[in-house]
Amino acid sequence: MKKGRAKKLLGICIFLMGLMIFSVLPVQAATPRMYTIQPGKTWTRYDITGDGKKDRIKVVRRKSQYDGCWNGADIYVNNTKVCAINKTFMDMSIRIITLSNGKPFLCLRGGTDNDISVFHGLYQYRNGKIVQVVNFINETYGRPVNEAKIYLSGNTIRVRTEAMSYSLGYCTTEFTYKYQKGTLLRTSNYGKYIKLNAANKRTGLFAAAKNIQAYTTPTSGSKAFVIRKNTGVKILNFWTTGNKMYIRVKNGSKTGWIKAVTFKESQGYAGSPQFSRVMYTG
C-alpha cells in the first residue's frame, strides 16, 4: 500500500512539475504565411474574416467588350459579395497574407499595358466588407508598375514597390508596415530607395539639370542651400505623407531635402526636369 501511495504521489508531483514548466515556457508565435490564389475559382482553405475559421473565397472578374481586358472585379466571402473593384485592368494578382497573430489580409493588384498598376494595396475584412487599408499607389509623383515584393516577419510586413518616378526615373522603394490598432500601419513617413536605375552606374550619382533649392527638413520650408546645375547629387531616402513628397539628397558635403516632381511639373513624359538623362522608361 505504501509503495502504491508513493508511486501515486510521485506521479502527481511529476504532473504538477510539468504544468509549472509548461506555464513558464514562452508561447511560440505562428509563422506568418502568404498564399497566391487565382480569380474565378472558389477557395476554401483560408481564413479571411479573422475568426479562425476557413472561409469560402472567390474573386470574379467582370468581362469587358475589349479582348484581354476586364471591367473590374467582385470579391465574395461565404457566398456574399464583400468588395467591388471598379477599375479596368488586364491582369490581376491576389495574395492572402496571415500574420503571426493570425490576422489575415489580402494583397490585390490590377495591371494594364507596360505593367502599370491601376490598383495595388492591402485589404482587410471589416464589418462584413473587404476594404483597402494600405494603398501602394501614389500617382502624383510617379507611375506605379509591377507587383510588389512582400517580406513577412511576425506581425510586420516590408513592401517593395516599383515606380517610374517623375524626379528619378525607374526606382524601387520600400516601406515597413506593422500590425497596430487592429490593422496594418506604416511605421514611418520615411521610405528607402532600394534601387535607382537612372543613377550613374560608376558613381551612383545624378547630375542636376538646373539649380535646385534644398531645404533643411521636409516640413519646415527653411532653405538650406542651392544645388548647382551639372553638379553630382547622391539620393539618400525620401519622406512622404498625403500628397507631399521630399527627397533627401547629398550634394558635395551638404545634405538637404528637395521637393519631388509631380506629373504636371514633369512636362508630360519628356524626362525629369530636375536631373539630366533621366527618361521615363524601364
Q: What positions do the PLM features span?
A:
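Bacterial N-terminal signal peptides that target proteins for export
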Residues: 2-13
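Short aromatic loop motif centered on NTY/YTY
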Residues: 91-124, 129-204
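Bacterial N-terminal signal peptides
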Residues: 12-23
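Sec-dependent signal peptide cleavage junction
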Residues: 21-33
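SH3-family beta-barrel domains
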Residues: 183-216, 262-282
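A short beta-strand motif characteristic of beta-propeller blades
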Residues: 33-34, 81-87, 134
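SH3/SH3-like beta-barrel superfamily modules
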Residues: 226-278
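Acidic carboxylate motifs that coordinate Ca2+ or other divalent cations, activating on Asp/Glu
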Residues: 51
